[in-house]
Design a protein with these regions (language model features):
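Conserved functional micro-motifs across diverse proteins
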Residues: 7, 24-86, 92-174
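Secretory targeting and sorting signals
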Residues: 1-25
Length: 174
């Protein structure tokens, strides 16, 4: 009886391993995404739209209007020196099917040296990148800011992700 139990468990484990290796893993797009340094203009081509994107700087800033709660100054939830960060981003729409496609697709994530990722915070600032990308027809050049609440470590990489699929579109290293 014990021998049959061992044989049965071995067969089940082998079948599960074989099934797991046959399942198609999602394609990793990070190898296809351009990687550059701050100030480099990177071409983002998804097949649906093409844009030239430049992240020119990342620096601490005062909280913009509508930023909401910040963790700075709260000893339990923040580290000393934590503050909102702002990235200056310039986007040139090379080929877009409609003027607002990049506003619905772009998500700039700030990543720390220890792999903490900060999602962009929506603000009421007039130069917020989400606000200016709403009207970016072919050939338009728009410039705006992306804001993060960097409550642990400072941002060392800016990663452009597709908001809908999560694909890695571009990356800038500081």
């Amino acid at each position: 009886m014990r021998r049959w139990l061992i044989v049965l468990s071995t067969v089940l484990i082998a079948a599960a391993t074989h099934t797991a290796t046959d399942v198609a893993a999602p394609r990793a797009w990070a190898g296809d995404a351009p990687i550059g340094h701050i100030g480099d203009t990177l071409r983002v081509d998804t097949g649906t739209y093409v844009a030239d994107v430049t992240v020119s700087s990342v620096a601490p800033c005062d909280p913009p209007p509508g930023f909401g709660y910040t963790r700075s100054g709260v000893p339990i939830k923040s580290f000393p020196g934590s503050t909102p960060n702002r990235a200056d981003v310039t986007v040139r729409a090379v080929r877009v099917p409609n003027p607002f496609i990049m506003a619905t697709a772009f998500s700039f994530t700030g990543v720390t040296p220890y792999a903490d990722a900060y999602k962009p915070r929506t603000t009421d600032a007039p130069d917020d990148l989400d606000n200016v990308l709403v009207n970016a027809p072919n050939g338009a050049i728009v410039r705006g800011g992306v804001y993060w609440d960097a409550y642990r470590d400072p941002v060392s990489n800016v990663v452009l992700l597709d908001r809908k699929t999560g694909h890695h579109l571009a990356q800038w290293n500081l």
